[in-house]
Each structure stands twice: as structure tokens, then as C-alpha cells.
Amino acid sequence: MNNFKGTFITFEGGEGTGKSTQSKLLYEYLINKNINTILTREPGGCLESEEIRNILLKGNLDKWDPITESLLHNAARREHIMKIIKPALLANKIVICDRF
């Protein structure tokens, strides 16, 4: 049985299509309606995920073996889910994510 009570909304799309803008607009709208909502993003979303993101973005983009890079991305996502998304959903919050 699913114990999650909250709602997860993600905005997806190519670069420059308005994902961040629409995420922020929806977040502001829900907050103004006093609806318990958080706004987060991927890649990143929590301190640990941001640290991994920064590791991946520094220097030569081809320095990582594809499998290593994939594992780092998955580690960042796991931290984001366990530290931000899952607790918010269990607390019956709406989670808006700029990409996922």
C-alpha cells in the first residue's frame, strides 16, 4: 500500500521552454493559497545533491566514464528523494520539481 499522501508535480522539457518559470509561478500560487508546498529541482535539490552536481560540472565534461557519471547522477537523485521529496510527500505536502 502507498503511504504517500502528498502530490509530486514535475515540469519537464527542453532548454528555454519555461520549466523554471512555470514551476515558480505554480509554487507562488499555491503558497498564496496557504497550501503546504515545496519547490525543488534536479539536478540538485539538497546539499548533498548539489555537491555531486558541482563535481560533475567542474572541468572537462568528458573526464567521467559514462557508468561513473550515471552512478553519480543516481547518487544525487537518491539523496534528493530521501532527504527532500519523500519526507515532504509523507508530510502531505505538494512537491514541485523543476525537472526530475
Question: Where is each model-derived feature located?
Answer:
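Walker A (P-loop) phosphate-binding loop of P-loop NTPases
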Residues: 16
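Hydrophobic positions on the alpha1 helix immediately C-terminal to the Walker A/P-loop
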Residues: 22, 26
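Hydrophobic anchor at the beta1->P-loop junction of P-loop NTPases
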Residues: 9-11
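ATP-dependent small-molecule kinase phosphotransfer cores
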Residues: 33-100
